[in-house]
Amino acid sequence: LIRSNANVTYIALTNLSEENLIYTPERISKLNVIKIMDIIYYKKKEYPKSLDFLLSSKNISLIKIGLKIRAFYNHRADTDQILQLLYHPSESVQTEVLKTINKLLLVEAEDKLLEIITSHSKKFQINCYRCLANIGTIKTTNFISDTIHVIKDVDIQLSAIYCIEQLNPIQAEQLASTNFELQKMLKHVKTVWK
């Protein structure tokens, strides 16, 4: 606790540069992430360009803070750098990337998400479908229609049904009419997930 508060204090007292943030610990509590975000906001009222290095850091905590900063300031420049982080080995970074894509409404991420969704963990797939529910197009609805029957996990199927229902309720109804289990899932999504 003392060490983490000392790190936050150090960040508050120094300028926000790569040299000063390099000693940030690999794991930071959510509370300290909020404190760091507050410090950055109070020091810089607009997007701090000097913090672009965070997304290319080796430190997972700094990458996640960099993504949160991008989302907070609605900074959409260099989206390729954000999308490349979908391939980061840390699942927590991948999850933060999905949150950032969702908050920034990066529709250009749709193709990449559809390309990689099935090769990732259950948690990633669920979060990915929730993200696609906001940024997806007909490509996403067609992808779900084509793949829903091969998805074995019920939670992932529910997320896919939620996604298609958000994007195109008519297509969701048509898809659900092909299978009793999908009908039940669609009904569940409409009543419980709303």
Where are these regions (language model features)?
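Amphipathic alpha-helical scaffolding segments comprising HEAT/armadillo-like alpha-solenoid repeats
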Residues: 1, 14-27, 44-56, 75-87, ...
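Alpha-helix N-cap/helix-start positions at coil->helix boundaries
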Residues: 3, 7, 29-34, 45, ...
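Generic cytosolic/nucleocytoplasmic N-terminal low-complexity/intrinsically disordered segments
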Residues: 4, 34, 42, 102, ...
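Alpha-solenoid HEAT/ARM repeat scaffold
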Residues: 7-11, 30-37, 64-65, 80, ...
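Core register positions within helices of long alpha-helical scaffolds
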Residues: 9-15, 38-42, 69-72, 100-103, ...
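Alpha-helical adaptor scaffolds
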Residues: 91, 95-99, 103, 107-118, ...
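Ankyrin-repeat and related helical/solenoid repeat scaffolds used for protein-protein interactions
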Residues: 122-166
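Terminal, low-structured helical/coil segments at or just beyond the last alpha-helical repeat
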Residues: 176-194
